[in-house]
Amino acid sequence: MTEGVQNERTGYKRVMLKLGGEMFGGGAVGIDPDVVQNVARQIASVARTGAEIAVVIGGGNFFRGAQLQQRGLDRNRSDYMGMLGTVMNCLALQDFLEQEGIDCRVQTAINMAQVAEPYLPLRAKRHLEKGRVVIFGAGMGMPYFSTDTTAAQRALEIDCEVLLMAKAVDGVYDDDPRTNPDAQLFHQITPREVIEKGLKVADATAFSLCMDNKMPILVFNLLTEGNIARAVAGEQIGTLVQS
């Protein structure tokens, strides 16, 4: 079942794509080359249309700082371990994008001069204007900030039009669709409705950044082939969170 206003959407010129690290592992620890290659092919097909694409990747296929903390590790140290995991994912995606013939740059919030550029928003925007895909690694470079928050902050700083949240579900539901077959998918919803209904779109800090700065969020299913292109083109997929 579906719910929400189904307004006509228009395509986007510059987007921020947030990818969960767990997807890169294919459900296991490490990197699944087949998954990363598939994602790279989807991004490459969109980049060839002239759309400007920035990417933030999580590191959950290697480390999750909060989970490591529960096992007794220092939270600061475990968060930095997670940041290093994101960089490994960034380099893997960069390699597969270059195999597709797409010019690509990795920028990190922690200085890693031998493998990536430092995060410089003006340089990132210039790369995008030249048709390069830009991948941001190492989160915010500080503990206690998620990669969802990184994606929201970077999207605002480099003037993206929308934050595309790639998930393993079709969008935002009023209940868990895996356990409730009658769960309703929202096609479009406002940030206020998300709060009132207690729905989960992104972590609280990321969601607040987007809401306060009127940054639309599109939650969609990455596992459906071609959905990145559909999302960038503004087709009616997933859930659009917009005032």
Swiss-Prot record:
Pfam families: AA_kinase. It catalyses: UMP + ATP = UDP + ADP. ATP binds at K18, L19, G20, G21, G60, R64, Y173, D176. One of its GO terms (biological process) is 'de novo' CTP biosynthetic process. Pathway: Pyrimidine metabolism; CTP biosynthesis via de novo pathway; UDP from UMP (UMPK route): step 1/1. GO terms for cellular component: cytoplasm. UMP binds at G59, D79, M140, G141, M142, P143, Y144, F145, S146, T147. Keywords: ATP-binding, Cytoplasm, Kinase, Nucleotide-binding, Pyrimidine biosynthesis, Transferase. Signal peptide: none annotated. It is found in: Cytoplasm. Its EC number is 2.7.4.22. Belongs to the UMP kinase family. Homohexamer. This is Uridylate kinase. The gene is pyrH.
